[in-house]
Amino acid sequence: MIAVAPVVFALLAASPAPKTPKPDAREIHTSALVIDTHADTPQRFLDERFDIGTVTPVADGHMDLQKIRAGNLGAEFFSIWVDPNHHTRYAHRALQLIDAVYEQTRRHAAEMTMAFSAADILAARQGPSKKLAVLMGVEGGHAIEDDLGILRDFYRLGVRYMTLTWSNTNEWADSSGDIKDTKIAHHNGLTDFGKDVVREMNRLGMMVDISHVSDKTFFDALNVTRAPVIASHSSARALTNSPRNMTDEMLKAVAKNNGVVQVNFFSAFIDEGYRKAFNEQTPARNAALNALKAKLKDADPATQYRERDRLQKEWSARIPRPPLKSLIDHIDHIAKVAGEDHVGIGSDFDGVSSLPEGLDSVADLPKITDELAARGYSREQLHKILGGNLLRVFKECERVSEQLRASAPDHASH
């Protein structure tokens, strides 16, 4: 025994150290609070009379309750988006969309519940039912029709973020979507009224969303805000050179502000090859869409929406979908440039015509966790990215609001 002991010890010393087990990505995903900050499903509720309890093919939509359960989605910010190309009564259309969200939640109360605070999100996920926390964000400041009273009304109805612009420059903020269009009157960022909008959003506790805005508007908003900002559905410009994406300088500015960038899943925002091909077909695609609009000018809204969506998807399908790796690269890049506390997910489900391979609907969200875990992201990091970072920002905006409301008069009667 004494003679063989040194040999045994030598063999043990020569043996490789046991490998650290890889995190169980699916268990991590299941245990996470998954928050997505952008889905355009309300358009389907209103224009298609779509019921979220109806299981639909992925070709027809990215979201239904079955897919939501499969993807372990815990909270969704449904987009209240008013297309300025098809509607002129912006606030009226926004109210219709808000009503449609409430109606779906009422209809499926066993599985969905309206949420108005960070605490409400957490409460919705308690117990065996684990309901989907339903929140709303207005996409495009034109919806308030230059009226802070309408902004306050949206807050009272449950809107908890507003994107300062959509792809159109409004009366008080420049958009990235038309910043190079010389026919559009621009403001060089935010006007004085636009700065008042940001201040009032801070006071209300409504998160300031800087997706879609021009670079100058972005920096103006960060100079004015007293609360963290969000980019509800934007990706990294260093990887995909779209003005809708954020430069590394902007990513670092969001980190300094303690905000969060929620990565968009649209193929043209996450893959440079796809973006170039998509832009090359834009003139022909727009001509086809305009011809369809003229053809359907007397059709009902549901038909117009359905046919427009079908045609856009047909054109996008002519371009090969990028790999899922492209999306993961954007999350990884933002985590490295801004920090792991400043990145999340903002899918743009039901609002885009192409998603990366393997990501066909909300049911496929666990694949994102799989890929990030394979790159070495820990359980704690994944929980932050999947929802923890957004929840932190939401709570901080609520805290700032409490301070401002305590020191400023209530404008409710104005």
Where are these regions (language model features)?
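Short, contiguous, pocket-lining structural segments
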Residues: H186-F193, D209-S214, M246
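Alpha-helix-loop-beta-strand connector modules within alpha/beta enzyme cores
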Residues: A185-M201, A221-A231
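Active-site-adjacent beta->alpha loops and helix N-cap segments on the catalytic face
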Residues: N170-I179, G189-L190, S214-V224
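N-terminal hydrophobic targeting/anchoring segments and the immediately downstream early-domain regions
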Residues: A14-A185, R237, N241-H414
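Short, hydrophobic/aromatic alpha-helical segments in well-folded domains
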Residues: G137, I150, F193-L204, T217, ...
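Alpha-helical elements of the RecA-like P-loop NTPase motor core of helicases
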Residues: Q43, K216-D220, V229
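Substrate-binding cleft of carbohydrate-active enzyme catalytic domains
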Residues: D196-I210, K216-D220, M250-K256, H333
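Bacterial N-terminal signal peptides
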Residues: I2-A13
